[in-house]
Amino acid sequence: MERYYAAIDLKSFYASVECIERGLDPMDTNLVVADSSRTEKTICLAVSPSLKAYGISGRARLFEVVEQVKRTNYGRRMRLANKEFSGESIFSSELDKDASLAISYLAAPPRMALYTKYSTDIYQIYLKYVAPEDMHVYSIDEVFIDLTGYLKTYEMTPEELVQRMVSDVLKQTGITATAGIGTNLYLAKIAMDVMAKRMQPDENGFRLASLDELSYRQELWGHTPLTDFWRIGRGTAKKLEANGMRRLGDVARRSLTQAGEDQLYQLFGINAELLIDHAWGWEPCTIADIKAYRPMNNSLSAGQVLKEPYDTEKTRVVVQEMGEMLALDLTGKELVCDQLTLTIGYDVKNLQERQLKTAYRGEVTTDAYGRKIPKHSHGSVNLDQHTASSRLIIEAVLGLFDRIINPDLLVRRITIGANHVILEKDMRPAQVDLFAETEMLKTEQERLKKEKSIQKAMLEMKNKYGKNAVLKGIHFEKGATGRERNGQIGGHKA
């Protein structure tokens, strides 16, 4: 039996929510979701469709929005006889009718808790039509659904069923979507990401496209750029292009011979298998496989991008805060770990300011924007036992920090991770050192037990009264970010 999957992506989700909360039409309102209290370099979490129409990408930085609107307004003004605007508007319908109006837009600060609530409500709407075991939540605004078992029940085609679900979401929330249907998960994703987004929307802004293996090869084997395809980043695309493969059809053709397949494995290792499958439009993984998957190794990690470059002293404060937060996260989930990792990313200013640049003699790399930066510092440290003790974790991560940090450089990014994470109840008893003092071991175990009780009490208070209900002195030191981040979800305002 042929299977049918749907991928549904809520249209400019955060921006749509902000429009709806203001009683505005998401398809007609120029709005950007960005924290303007930060610098203009802050990334926009969402841009409304009407604002995107002026050439602004969905993940632009705020200054890019400002500059593009300014450029577009200059062009509009130059076309006016008197070279002066009569007013301004945030509505595309008004701007289309009246060329004398300047383009304006709303900048809405992120409200992550609100977006999470909308996402949960929309998930409940989907559950009216399909069971949870046939749905995989890919992100806050995107889901995959196995439609196969429901087509006969509803006496509908895959397209009709998806249309009904999206119409229900629109009716109840005001948010529209883009959707793709495919005979496997990959084709559903590509139908949505590539095919649907180049189609004309209906009167509600809804786009829908379908693909099977044959139509995928006919429609998309010649498509460029390669980065439009799921899981093909700039690095992979560059490597393919350097070897004469500028389209997925080229990859499929190369894989037909043993020599070509061997070359792909030499270039990409085990990832070549997935690349070849996707070039042909194959994807064996199902939603049932995703639900059944259990990783061999578990880890927890947290990272943050600092608002400004930090020196070593202030960075150490943040690392200590992050170590404590990681320990509390483990405690709350009844987990323990026995290894920590730390990555310190340095700021671009280190190679721009003459004094810093001349002092640096280390390895240089490039960031996502092609700018030269010092190579990051990375290290790991093993703990003597599985633990969630904030004392042991902070001691270990600060020792690791002191070992790997380049004190002459300014820091911009910090990532901390806990590896070999297991459930606390699955811990093996610690190996007893025959030469250790029995009394010392007993004292340490009692100390760890007390620490665990304190950490649990802190979590209970934070859960009841808010994350800033219990704070330590470190949270008030210069450079500390913990208090502010406690009011955020995913690094953005809750």
State each model region's role.
Residues 1-287, 439-494:
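Gly/Gly-Pro- and Ser/Thr-rich, intrinsically disordered tail segments characteristic of DNA damage-repair
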Residues 11-13, 37-41, 346-351, 421-424:
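Short, charged/polar surface micro-motifs in flexible loops or helix N-caps
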Residues 17, 370-494:
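Acidic, metal-coordinating catalytic segment for phosphate/diphosphate chemistry
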Residues 70-83, 299, 312-323, 327, ...:
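Contiguous hydrophobic segments
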Residues 176-178, 341, 413-415:
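Residues at or immediately flanking beta-strands
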